[in-house]
Amino acid sequence: MTGDADEGRDVVRRDRFSGGPARGFLSSLAADERIFEADLAVDRAHVVMLDEQDIIGTDDAAAILGALDDVEAAGHGSLTDGEDVHAAIETAVIERVGDRGGKMHTARSRNDEVAACIRYRLREDVLAAVEATLEAREMLLDVAGDHTETVMPGFTHLQPAQPTTVAHYLHSYASALARDTERLLDAYGRINRSPLGAAAFAGTPFDIDRERTAELLGFDGVVRNSMDAASARDFLVETTAAAAGLATTLSGLAEDLVVFSKAGYVELDDAYASTSSIMPQKKNPDTMELVRATAGDTAAGLNALLTILKGLPRAYNRDLQRAHPHAFEALDAVTEATEVAAGAVATADWKEPALSEAAGEGFSTATGVADLLAMEGVPFRTAHELVARAAEAGGDYAALSAAAEDILGGPLSEHVDKAAVEAALDPESSVASRDSLGGPAPESMAAALSAAGQRLDADAEALRERRGALATAADERERVVSSYDSTAPE
């Protein structure tokens, strides 16, 4: 995982703790490549603040910042010493500028430093996941807009239940993804708080400015209590739970597409399928099966994270080193799965004739007939019994008439017009009648798709605002750091 266990000196652990067989076990240096850039940003912001607060001299700050530039140019792979990226960078800085490099860690602990780096990187990954959900929602809504009148079977218990439309079906997943987007954005708000200045957990006697480092790093504020700031990892739980929820949404969509593909309702584009190594006729929905499996990956990560955190005493424990990888891995997996699922839907061929034919199977319009009778004054429970009796006899008008004679004691025509019943039996007419808010009727769906588009636009703007704020902070940090170039000692 890291460099030779018997060579190199870690400036944090010193000679006494720098060697031994456990060094590799303790090390997270290789895994920390993900937060390498985050650590450099955190170091720069901290050094600028130390200088501005007259805690270290400007010449020392300039030297340290210059060394950090060298470390960045050399890359993570050049870090050979240190049990983690934070210690390794500090070691590299001291190697370049001597003892003045040791001032970089003034008024700071690795506890608050690590927490800041995790939050700094995690927020970027959360926004990437948000972007993926936005693109998926847009694709779902685009395809739905093309199929507001494409009738299809709707299911409960995987049995034909009621006819609906492809638009109604896809909009249901767009709605679920909108909630997933909302959960990710909510998590972002709690991730994007700075723990810097908490030090080990009890703060520091130095006259630091926590708000300044938060500003330079683009955080929306600070985690006020220093013990909470250093030890809290609930933001990881929230993020991983949001990722697992998103993966569960995608798993349902993927499962549907696998089933629909088997039934001949939809055909995935070749780019989202594969064939068999032995059976040349096969076209397998492999990508959807892997999307489906992502729900297991993310749920396992959430369970592992919760188990790691369960029962940890305040304030810092090394168990936390094993915590954040689960959040990163969950976000990686679900972001890719979202992109793949969206592409599969966008390029799929919905087989309208097959869908239309299947829409009426299993007497799926039965509820519509019962509703019609109830509208004409027949108690719904009685109408339900009548239609259930007719379903046993075939579910056509003749069966309904016979059931009416037995249950209502007279002809069906005394209660409802035959033409109305026949319309209720027709899947397309049945769908068109369901124009209540949220229903599948074309007019209702047009309104729903419009509202979904507006919500999508609002969420896209929220993403732009957050990324814009981070970019502004990065520009300001770069401007301030660059101003030290002219003061750097020769």
Swiss-Prot record:
Record carries keyword Chloroplast: no
Chain positions covered by the region annotation Disordered: 426-452, 469-490
Entry's EC annotation: 4.3.2.1
Name of one Pfam family that matches: ASL_C2
Bias (Low complexity): 440-452
GO MF term set: argininosuccinate lyase activity
Pathway linked to the protein: Amino-acid biosynthesis; L-arginine biosynthesis; L-arginine from L-ornithine and carbamoyl phosphate: step 3/3
Ranges annotated as biased composition (Basic and acidic residues): 469-480
PANTHER family, A to Z: ARGININOSUCCINATE LYASE (PTHR43814:SF1)
Annotated protein name in UniProt: Argininosuccinate lyase
Record organism: Natronomonas pharaonis (strain ATCC 35678 / DSM 2160 / CIP 103997 / JCM 8858 / NBRC 14720 / NCIMB 2260 / Gabara) (Halobacterium pharaonis)
Taxonomic lineage: Archaea, Methanobacteriati, Methanobacteriota, Stenosarchaea group, Halobacteria
Gene: argH
